[in-house]
Amino acid sequence: MRTHYCGAVTAADVGNTVTLCGWAHRRRDHGGVIFIDLRDREGMVQVVVDPDTPAAFKLAEDVRAEFVLKIEGKVRPRPAGTENPHLPTGMVEVLTLDLDVLNPSLTPPFQIDDETINENIRLQYRYLDLRREPMQKNLKLRYRVSKIMRDYLDTHGFMEVETPMLTRSTPEGARDYLVPSRVHDGMFYALPQSPQLFKQLLMVSGVDRYFQITKCFRDEDLRADRQPEFTQVDLETSFMGEEAIMGLVEGMIRDMMQKAQGIELPAAFPRMSYAEAMNRYGSDKPDLRVTLEIVDVGDVMRDVAFKVFATPANDPKGRVAALRIPGGATLSRSEIDGYTEFVKIYGAKGLAYIKVNDVGQLNEAGLQSPIVKNLSEAALHAVMERTGAQNGDLIFFGADRAKVVNDALGALRLKIGHEKGHVDGRAWAPLWVVDFPMFEYNEDENRWDALHHPFTAPKDGHEDWLATDPGKCLSKAYDMVLNGWEVGGGSVRIHREKVQEKVFAALNIGEEERREKFGFLLDALQYGAPPHGGLAFGLDRLVTLMAGAESIRDVIAFPKTQRASCLMTNAPNVVDEKQLRELHIRLRNPIAADKAA
């Protein structure tokens, strides 16, 4: 139907006849000549319809926004002074010879180029929202990113293998989406949270190098960077250790970002242990572009009169830490109050601070704060020395359980760093976070939980602690972090059945439960399972970062809202009683039951 995309018409086509198809973006009537900006996925070109083609002119008079048009015309230079250097096609226009309205359009609920549209309206009319240039760019970038990674993995000997979407429910840290079985009364499938166990079984099968770009599902509370269904670039390989796997996927990300957007990442990503990341940045996914750092001061606060500091300083699970803000003494009282309210989101009870007016006077004459009188000179000296405080700085303090302090000061570090310009100017700051603990203690249930998942291998020499002191065990896990986002995570897996049994025991998973939920894996590990490991990248997160999008929803064609609903199709929805009977399901909620009747 067409010879060219609208956005592909250039000065090289001057004098040629072209056929274009697209949407009427804008129509203007100037002194008896009609101008139509015709748009398709590749861009826009100006079309001119004059009375010398009366049939086309008559049709053009009735054209409105978003009509679908087919236009045959001759490419000519724009008249001098009317060129548009901001448009790739801005040096030419198409003089219409023939016009056909392929389909009219209702008046759209918003202008396609309106950047202030309410997101709910955008999601309700997603098929119109996707016509907008930013959304088209995001979809193209997403496709290019996935294609480059697929090509890279193919070049490195990986084979794409599909794994099941209907599987069994196994605990992986979030709630499963359950699918009732019609033929197995009272039984359910689960949609996979990841292909984790299947890709390990593929390694046992001798596939050697596997990858898949696949949908995963988690029934969890949503945030800006989460969706109930999301896309993973998933890979697994046999006979490779941590360093080899990290090197391979680091090369993939470097290759992809260079080819997709011309971004040059460093030749080798820095490495940082989990413990160091938490200590210095309060997060296991630190944004290294922010120059502010958290400093421990708990050891010098154990004997101070200020109980807010002394109590957590003497608690093995507590932490007292400081965050220096260069030039922060100029912060107003209202700004400090705002930051105090901000950290309360993360469980902090408040936010103590000291304004440094004269670092040489370790008393109320040189340090402005109601807490100074309750701190010893030795403690104040240690704080000033460790933080590197200078005159005009401000020091914030966190004092609570270690998790609260890390969460609160870690978030505050990012907020102030970006708001006040405490960044180093880099556009991209990748790193690997390594040496994660195997387990974290669940105080509510008085048990150990796997920090990543229960199939992660312990560090060499740590296996013996699984039974005696699980908290000391470190794992062969690694996360790739980019600008404060975890874009990928993986590990070397357990390939020996006896070690897997020990990990299940440390997690208080009894023998009967192990066999019921993971018997197939334990059996497979006894049939010559090779050493193996892998990693999964969140494609949605990665593209969001690269696109500079505000939300992950902006890089997904048909996303769900933060309430896990689709405003366009009204999913989820009720189903009729006949369908429920076939699935052997009766609704206990009377409202839902009435709707289904």
Curated annotation (Swiss-Prot):
A GO CC term? cytoplasm
Q: Point out the annotated site residues (description: Important for tRNA non-discrimination).
A: H30, G81
Positions of transmembrane segments: none
Q: Where does L-aspartate bind?
A: E172, R218, H452, R493
Main location as per UniProt: cytoplasm
Q: What is its EC number?
A: 6.1.1.23
- The lineage's top-level taxon is Bacteria
Entry-linked InterPro entries: Aa-tRNA-synt_II, aa-tRNA-synth_II, aa-tRNA-synth_II/BPL/LPL, Asp-tRNA-ligase_1, Asp-tRNA-ligase_1_N, Asp/Asn-tRNA-synth_IIb, AspRS_core, GAD-like_sf
Q: Where is this region: Aspartate?
A: 196-199
Q: Would you tell me the protein name for this molecule? A: Aspartate--tRNA(Asp/Asn) ligase
Query: Which species expresses this protein natively?
Result: Thiobacillus denitrificans (strain ATCC 25259 / T1)
